[in-house]
Amino acid sequence: MNNDVFPNKFKAALAAKQVQIGCWSALSNPISTEVLGLAGFDWLVLDGEHAPNDISTFIPQLMALKGSASAPVVRVPTNEPVIIKRLLDIGFYNFLIPFVETKEEAEQAVASTRYPPEGIRGVSVSHRTNMFGTVADYFAQSNKNITILVQIESQQGVDNVDAIAATEGVDGIFVGPSDLAAALGHLGNASHPDVQKAIQHIFNRASAHGKPSGILAPVEADARRYLEWGATFVAVGSDLGVFRSATQKLADTFKK
């Protein structure tokens, strides 16, 4: 049986430096995720760090995206091999790893997604991703079809951006603007010049190592500026933000 995740088109698009416009999925609901999957985004982040998601909520969302052209990307709650292994087994193959500060942490993230001898991923012969054992070449194809995006959101991460970006197996560098702003002493103000300078520096250093860079930018002017700075995978909003804004606008139209 063929596995429709191979080849990984999102990974290939990143490697080719093709602009990929994405959206955040934070409502943890398969219907809202299915609607996002119909909108035409290149990729969607299913958030396991700041949204109320777990294995039981991720599976129906992956099912809802089965016919979508939007690539599902999971942001794991933490860079931990067992968590990553379980997410691999339920159907994810694109990973966003939060709060990576060193080359060693980047290497651990990569190793967690690779079968031995390249990594430490535990082996199950039957799970959702290999269609419960019916994909004959899954083991041969898996390692080279996993996407690892590491998130830089601290001063230490900025200081080590060159080593992180140069790590074999890291496919892209993602900036966490809110946590980065907090780490630089500007909590709640990612627009501060110091934060913007750090973001542009991260983009530049990622590019110097041949790696694409990305960011979450729900404000259009910010998203367009980051694209001009060279970011290629940009999430331009979230389901939660769009829902809140639209419902507030609708209520205001009739209540004011």
Curated annotation (Swiss-Prot):
Needed cofactors = Mg(2+)
Single GO biological process annotation from the record: galactarate catabolic process
Please name the GO terms that the record assigns under molecular function.
2-dehydro-3-deoxyglucarate aldolase activity; magnesium ion binding
Catalytic activity, reaction form: 5-dehydro-4-deoxy-D-glucarate = 2-hydroxy-3-oxopropanoate + pyruvate; 2-dehydro-3-deoxy-D-glucarate = 2-hydroxy-3-oxopropanoate + pyruvate
**Swiss-Prot/TrEMBL site (Increases basicity of active site His) positions:** D89
EC number(s)? 4.1.2.20
Q: Which PANTHER family match?
A: 2-KETO-3-DEOXY-L-RHAMNONATE ALDOLASE, 5-KETO-4-DEOXY-D-GLUCARATE ALDOLASE
Q: What is this protein called?
A: 5-keto-4-deoxy-D-glucarate aldolase
